[in-house]
A protein has these predicted regions:
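Hydrophobic residues on the short alpha-helix immediately C-terminal to a glycine-rich phosphate/catalytic loop
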Residues: 6, 98-99
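Hydrolases whose catalytic domains are alpha/beta-hydrolase-1, hotdog thioesterase
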Residues: 94-98, 120
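Gly/Ala-rich beta-loop-alpha elbow adjacent to hydrolase catalytic centers
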Residues: 86-91, 95
Length: 124
């Protein structure tokens, strides 16, 4: 919802009429790093350093959700090469993971202030 507000503030959605924007909001869940407080999160976070445990199941579920959104657009006649995904923080991490695991060729991925989750599962 916060990114939609930014796009609306700068009239991006209105001036780019040939572009369809989809702004999914992460589900509400407890985030361990924030003392279990419930908030929007694509997956649980346990720590900020590279050695912190990762919520593999949550990351894979969120990545699948994004890939399902991509597939919906392809099913609606949009070539995957015209689909770009992106996100900020956990959303960026989800977008990166989805982009690297999708079977589709994408136009690109925009990942801001983020990291690659499950990085050890990818080739160097």
């Amino acid at each position: 919802e916060s990114w939609l507000e930014v796009f609306d503030m700068y009239n991006i959605s209105k001036t780019a009429r040939h572009v369809k924007f989809i702004f999914p909001t992460a589900p509400i869940r407890p985030i361990t790093l924030n003392y279990g407080m419930t908030m929007t999160g694509w997956f649980d976070a346990f720590g900020l350093d590279r050695s912190a445990k990762e919520d593999e199941q949550g990351i894979l579920e969120s990545s699948k959700y994004v890939n399902d959104l991509i597939q919906d657009e392809v099913n609606n006649g949009i070539p995957s090469q015209r689909v770009m995904i992106g996100g900020f923080s956990q959303g960026g991490a989800t977008a990166l993971h989805a982009a690297l695991t999708t079977t589709h060729s994408l136009a690109g991925v925009l990942a801001l202030s983020t990291w690659l989750p499950l990085s050890s599962t990818f080739p160097k």
